[in-house]
């Protein structure tokens, strides 16, 4: 079934229980309750989900939103082993990881992860890679909600010096921080570490973990699911792919054939998409009214659709389906869970369902550039980052509902 296009108000379905309680008093909203221990409400009662579903971190929320249930936790050791065994883990945060004083030693408080989407095509050198998608995933200390905040790729940032490969630092677009960190042997790990430092300096947020998501690898995950429901809000011609004799291929490869090429056009409407189509659509920014902001929203839609499909298909409770999904995910991700084992992430975030994922936007979803043609984040966006850092997102959204990205 296609993703519904109805937008829900933030005082109802798109904020957590604490925020909904606050919204019930029209005159003076009550602030969210103090953070409760993981997996329990502020009243001390175990949290019960509307749709308890198993397996929450094979795509690491946002790129990983498959949720665990208390029922299926029994005997789940083998499932967790598959998840951890299929996904490469390495240090992606460097000095941008949370210190013990910031709560980095465990997951009892709020959880912040940096998700980086890269386009690593086989013909490209490993060092010639930029992070075109930059997302902060925030889970409040109540562990009953997840927020995705996309940072525009063209945001002007101060990239710090990186001693590991001799990069001296400088002013650049956010997407270029990954490229500079990957040079001179830095590789993807170096790219992620320099990006994490850059985003920490920009937002003030330290991270519990990070993931590099190869969008080409995502194709295998979607194909393992069969297809995912996506909605095209605005017709757009692909800037990356063409058809030659009915076969879809990269534009560069299509040109080499010497044959007539037909453009791939993503028509308006909702439908099930195969991996190549969903990924190609989520990559587009040229030809869209709001450029990179529309692309951010489409990529957030992709992530949420993958999570919902995985849960709806029962992939999380079927060992054979899960094995195939984990193997495909292992080709799409590099992961860093900091000082905490991946299994702990899975169990800590088992109370978050796909419908609890809130998609947020910076700068009101419109480009705001400077004389250099780079994006500059406005004061409201900076306040949103401050709300993430102080774990006040539910209250912030009640006060600023315009930051919620419209559902498709």
Predicted regions and their residues:
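Non-catalytic, solvent-exposed segments at the cell envelope interface
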Residues: 2-64, 68-408
């Amino acid at each position: 079934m296609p993703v519904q296009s109805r937008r829900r108000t933030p005082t109802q379905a798109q904020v957590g229980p604490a925020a909904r309680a606050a919204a019930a008093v029209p005159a003076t909203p009550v602030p969210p309750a103090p953070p409760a221990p993981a997996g329990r409400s502020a009243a001390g009662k175990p949290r019960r989900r509307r749709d308890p579903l198993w397996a929450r971190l094979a795509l690491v929320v946002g790129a990983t939103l498959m949720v665990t249930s208390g029922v299926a936790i029994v005997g789940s050791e083998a499932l967790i082993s598959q998840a951890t065994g299929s996904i490469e883990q390495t240090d992606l945060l460097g000095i941008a990881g949370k210190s013990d004083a910031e709560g980095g030693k465990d997951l009892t408080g709020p959880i912040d992860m940096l998700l980086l989407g890269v386009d690593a095509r086989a013909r490209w050198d490993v060092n010639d890679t930029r992070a075109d998608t930059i997302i902060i995933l925030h889970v409040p200390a109540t562990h009953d909600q997840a927020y995705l905040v996309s940072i525009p790729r063209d945001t002007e940032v101060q990239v710090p010096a990186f001693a590991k490969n001799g990069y001296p630092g400088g002013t650049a677009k956010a997407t270029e921080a990954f490229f500079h960190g990957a040079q001179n042997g830095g590789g993807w790990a170096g790219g992620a570490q320099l990006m994490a430092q850059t985003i920490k300096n920009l937002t003030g947020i330290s991270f519990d973990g990070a993931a590099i998501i190869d969008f080409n690898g995502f194709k295998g995950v979607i194909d393992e699911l069969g297809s995912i429901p996506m909605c095209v809000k605005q017709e757009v011609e692909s800037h990356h792919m063409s058809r030659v004799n009915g076969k879809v291929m990269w534009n560069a490869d299509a040109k080499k054939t010497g044959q007539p090429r037909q453009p791939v056009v993503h028509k308006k409407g909702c439908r099930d998409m195969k991996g190549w189509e969903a990924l190609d659509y989520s990559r587009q920014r040229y030809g869209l009214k709001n450029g990179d902001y529309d692309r951010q929203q489409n990529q957030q839609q992709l992530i949420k659709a993958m999570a919902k499909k995985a849960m709806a298909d029962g992939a999380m409770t079927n060992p054979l389906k899960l094995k195939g999904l984990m193997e495909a995910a292992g080709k799409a991700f590099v992961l860093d869970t900091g000082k905490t084992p991946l299994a702990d992430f899975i169990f800590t975030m088992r109370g978050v369902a796909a419908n609890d994922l809130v998609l947020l936007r910076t700068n009101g979803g419109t480009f705001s550039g400077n004389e250099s043609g780079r994006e500059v984040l406005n004061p409201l966006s900076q306040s949103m980052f401050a709300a993430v850092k102080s774990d006040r997102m539910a209250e912030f959204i009640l006060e600023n509902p315009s930051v919620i990205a419209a559902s498709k």
